[in-house]
Curated annotation (Swiss-Prot):
NCBIfam families cross-referenced by the UniProt entry: ispD
Broadest EC class assigned to this enzyme: transferase
SS bond list: none
Keyword Transferase found: yes
PROSITE patterns: ISPD
Name assigned to this protein: 2-C-methyl-D-erythritol 4-phosphate cytidylyltransferase
Superkingdom of the organism of origin: Bacteria
EC number: 2.7.7.60
InterPro entries found in the cross-reference section: IspD, IspD/TarI, IspD/TarI_cytidylyltransf_bact, ISPD_synthase_CS, Nucleotide-diphossugar_trans
Site for Positions MEP for the nucleophilic attack, residues: R154, K207
């Protein structure tokens, strides 16, 4: 596979309201060890040594306050109320990118080494790369009434993390073809019939979504794990 040397731009959609988290503020701005989740997520990208530029996408009313939180070389732009619109807004200011990472601000403790591994796969010629972990629980499919309709084979299931990495050309094409709202960028790429490569993720790259997640994240920070 040909080795790519072009710029890597990381997009960080940060418009989530954090309703399930139980905090009275956007999720990305919740305190985590004396700083925000967003700041920690951006720091991880920068510390990886694999990212050339970071673009953070927030609601329009938070653009200026977000800029004051982050290093001056981080680009902050206004995005949509949903993830899809935010990623599109980020892509619009990433014209220089050969590769694009899309990273959840709520995965604030993602190790820089995982980010670097995703980029390494892209530079080795992969067009779409996602970190994953095996699923510990048995998963059921259910209908609208809650009746169980099936039990997928657990050995074939994986929980997907971020950053998800793509060639910029492929991700732009996937978003151009997208209709409606998507929660997973790789899913849009799959719709094009493209192959998505998975690599082993990291337990600490979990998404901070519930109050219990936040307790765990704060405990890890307090213990010096991050």
């Amino acid at each position: 596979m040909a080795e790519g040397r072009g710029p890597v731009v990381a997009l960080v959609p940060a418009a989530g309201q954090g309703v399930r988290l139980g905090e009275n503020k956007p999720k990305a701005f919740v305190d985590l060890g004396g700083t925000t989740m967003l700041t920690r997520a951006v720091d991880g990208l920068l510390q990886s040594g694999a990212v050339d530029r970071v673009v953070v996408i927030v609601p329009e009313e938070l653009v200026e306050s977000t800029r004051s939180l982050l290093p001056g070389h981080v680009t902050v732009v206004a995005g949509g109320s949903e993830r899809t619109g935010s990623v599109r807004a980020g892509l619009a200011v990433a014209d220089d990118a050969e590769y694009v990472l899309v990273h959840d601000a709520a995965r604030a403790l993602t190790p820089p080494s995982l980010i670097a591994r995703v980029v390494a796969e892209l530079r080795c010629g992969r067009r779409a790369v996602i970190p994953v972990l095996p699923v510990a629980d048995t998963i059921k499919t259910v209908d609208v009434l809650g009746a169980v309709t099936g039990t997928p084979e657990r050995s074939e299931l994986r929980a997907v993390q971020t950053p998800q990495g793509f060639t910029a050309e492929l991700l732009r094409r996937a978003y151009a073809a997208a209709d409606g709202i998507a929660t997973d960028d790789a899913g849009l790429v799959e719709r094009l019939g493209e192959r998505v490569r998975s690599i082993v993720g990291e337990p600490t790259a979990f998404k901070i979504t519930t109050p219990l997640d936040l307790v765990l994240a704060r405990a890890l920070v307090e213990e010096g794990a991050h």
